[in-house]
């Protein structure tokens, strides 16, 4: 049995390394409807689930709930809502409306862009090849330019976005959940600077998280997720492996998640007796480095539920098509980052950007 990342599920299933039937049996025994749909969909091989989802995390729009409420703004669940907030909150008290990733050679920009493009239904691959881009990509790039123009000048990545949010200089960033303990002043190497006390939970109490947001061409939206799986292999002692997974995903599931709660969201929310049992237990697990506190002490129940809900619509380019490898090569080449930056910097227009991306994509057929 192997604990592995999403990228190996379908290739290993196709190669016969995973015992798809055994893994599917475990999911059925635990209760398919107790798992986050997104985590299951990404592991689908035909009508079966090729590996058992264990845990995951989703990228998040991190935002100042207090500023949104004071300005009578809707939460940042869509391009339109984010643009409205940028327009209203930019320059307010010296604030930048957003801190978008603009450093083209940083994986952080690739990750943020994929999330933004997925939100509008953009997919760069299809089964057996590359997908030509059009209106959806154009809309996504236009949106990204708005948030980039509302950002400080320079080469921006995770470091600046976190620092500016912690200093109260921006109402919105996109980040991973590993920011959650830092927001609450539990990590001395990355303290909030919104007030004079670096251990204060004030910023955490004013922060909301959105994992799933949408563009105009994809009303249901999407969440960018990193999900991990248990895979029973073809040469495993099947009965022993099944028993281990059944225990780890039921009686022992809270212990499984406790290894790193802020990076291990429960993909299995509960069981037949309580559909939210594991979400509740997870929220009470201590997080932090220099100090510890449970997430439920730091964040309201609606915030916790928003975080976990992202796994319902979890997605990544190439997963459903069995083309994750091709999509990864495209992402690692970073040409989408570079062309997007040319557009942000007004060196090309949006139609030229779409055309250049299509020409570059064609090299990966």
Residues covered by each model-derived region:
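C-terminal lobe and pocket-closing loops
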Residues: 183-184, 200-201, 216-334
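Extracytoplasmic "Venus flytrap"/periplasmic binding protein-like
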Residues: 1-35, 66-77, 170-172, 187-193, ...
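Beta->alpha turn/N-cap motifs
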Residues: 3-8, 158, 175-180
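Short helix-loop capping/hinge motifs at secondary-structure junctions, enriched
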Residues: 66-76, 92, 123, 150, ...
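Short helix-initiation/N-cap motifs at beta->coil->alpha
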Residues: 79-83, 154-167
């Amino acid at each position: 049995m192997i604990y592995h990342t999403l990228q190996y599920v379908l290739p290993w299933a196709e190669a016969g390394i995973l015992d798809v039937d055994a893994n599917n049996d475990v999911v059925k025994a635990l209760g398919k409807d107790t798992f986050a749909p997104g985590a299951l969909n990404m592991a689908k091989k035909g009508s079966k689930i090729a590996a058992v989802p264990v845990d995951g995390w989703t990228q998040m729009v991190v935002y100042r709930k207090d500023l949104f409420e004071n300005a009578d703004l809707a939460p940042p669940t869509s391009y339109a809502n984010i643009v409205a907030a940028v327009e209203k909150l930019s320059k307010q008290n010296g604030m930048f409306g957003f801190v978008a990733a603009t450093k083209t050679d940083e994986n952080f920009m690739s990750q943020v862009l994929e999330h933004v493009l997925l939100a509008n239904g953009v997919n760069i691959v299809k089964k057996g090849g590359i997908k030509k881009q059009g209106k959806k990509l154009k809309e996504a790039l236009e949106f990204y330019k708005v948030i980039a123009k509302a950002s400080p000048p320079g080469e921006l990545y995770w470091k600046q976005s976190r620092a500016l949010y912690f200093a109260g200089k921006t109402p919105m960033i996109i980040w991973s959940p590993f920011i959650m303990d830092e927001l609450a002043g539990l990590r001395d190497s990355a303290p909030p600077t919104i007030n004079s006390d670096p251990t204060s939970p004030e910023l955490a109490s004013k922060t909301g998280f959105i994992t799933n947001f949408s563009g105009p061409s994809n009303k249901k939206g999407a969440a960018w997720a990193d999900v991990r799986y248990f895979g029973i292999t073809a040469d495993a002692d099947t009965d022993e492996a099944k028993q281990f997974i059944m225990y780890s995903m039921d009686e022992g599931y809270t212990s499984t998640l406790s290894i790193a709660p802020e990076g291990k969201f429960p993909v299995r929310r509960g069981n037949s007796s309580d559909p939210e049992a594991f979400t509740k237990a997870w929220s009470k697990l201590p997080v932090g480095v220099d100090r510890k506190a449970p997430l439920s002490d730091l964040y309201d129940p609606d915030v916790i539920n928003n975080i976990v809900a992202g796994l319902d619509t979890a997605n990544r380019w190439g997963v459903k098509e069995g083309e994750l490898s091709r999509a990864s090569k495209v992402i690692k080449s970073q040409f989408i980052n570079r062309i997007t930056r040319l557009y942000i910097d007004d060196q090309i227009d949006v139609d030229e950007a779409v055309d250049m991306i299509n020409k570059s994509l064609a090299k990966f057929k």
